[in-house]
Amino acid sequence: MFIKICGIKTVEELKIVEKYADATGVILKSTSKREISFEKAKELIEIAKIPIYAVSTVNTYDDWAKIIEKTGTKYIQIHSNMDLNEIIKLKNNYNVNIIKAFKVPSISPNPEKDAENLINDIMQYDNIVDKILLDTGKGTGKTHDLRISKILSEKIDIVLAGGLNPYNVKEIVEIIKPCGVDLSSGVEKDNKKDEELIKLFIKNLKYNDK
């Protein structure tokens, strides 16, 4: 299973995360408290042993091109309603690996209908982006309506995000069966990545592989 621990800010956090995760991420051009500068992102990307995704809510080709060129990243995670043709242009011009995030409602009165609408939206990106991520949105650290995620996971490969932590990951992954997980605040203590929480998260996640 693909494991991404996002929102690192320092070399110290990177050194911890890369021992346990398949990928990590840095937050750029965002209102998030985890936002860092292009210069810091470049520093982390250059020394990382695992892929670092540049994660942002920017929604234009020019803004993403600037991020890619300033940081040297080959991995991006798009959290916006960016025009599909501009995403294709990014892929063609920079050959970046792309995770495209889709927001799932916190609570849905009609999960089947919401899942159908999301599937129709997601299928436009088939063979264009590399991974599909389902998230609650805006790094809230809260789960979304998992009934929707379950329906989608039965039809397509998804990376699940939103409110995951060491204490709920086992049950949630058993229900949803995603191909990957992505989290940030769920393994933080005092606003920093905590190695003991990460180890516990991985232990409980791996329980599902037995």
UniProtKB/Swiss-Prot annotation:
An example molecular function term from Gene Ontology annotations: phosphoribosylanthranilate isomerase activity
GO annotation (BP), single: L-tryptophan biosynthetic process
Enzyme nomenclature, EC number: 5.3.1.24
Pathway per the UniProt entry: Amino-acid biosynthesis; L-tryptophan biosynthesis; L-tryptophan from chorismate: step 3/5
Domain of life per record: Archaea
Keyword Repeat in annotation: no
UniProt keyword terms in alphabetical order: Amino-acid biosynthesis, Aromatic amino acid biosynthesis, Isomerase, Tryptophan biosynthesis
UniProt keyword annotation of Amino-acid biosynthesis present: yes
Pfam families named in the record: PRAI
Similarity remark: Belongs to the TrpF family.
Protein name, entry field: N-(5'-phosphoribosyl)anthranilate isomerase
Gene encoding the protein: trpF
